Amino acid sequence: MKIVNRGYLSVKALQPFIEWVNAQEDEFILDERTEPNVYLIEEDFFDLEPVIKSNFKKIFLNELQAISEDEESYPAINMENFEAWFSVEAGTSVFDCEKGGVNAD
C-alpha cells in the first residue's frame, strides 16, 4: 500500500444542487444518497478555510459542467452559493491500495 502525497476535499451535493441537476437532466435523478466527489489538494494544510477559498470556484464549475454545458443555467459562482449547494469534508490521509500507477488527465 502506498501513501499518496495529497489531502482531499470530499464534496457532497446539498438540496439546491440536487434540485438544479434534476431540472437540467432527464437521464438520471440525483438525490441525497448520491456519493460525494473527491478532490485532491495539498497534503499539509492547517486551516481548511483558505484551502476551500482557493479551490471552490474550480470545484463548483467542475460539478456544474459535469451536468450541463449551458453556462446560462449556472448560479453565481461565489462562496455563499458554494456553501449552500455543497457540504465539504477534508482529510490529510490518502492511501492507494492498488499495485498499478495512478493515471491523471
What are these model-predicted stretches?
Residues 42-104:
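Amphipathic protein-protein interaction modules
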Residues 1-44:
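Extended, charge-biased low-complexity segments
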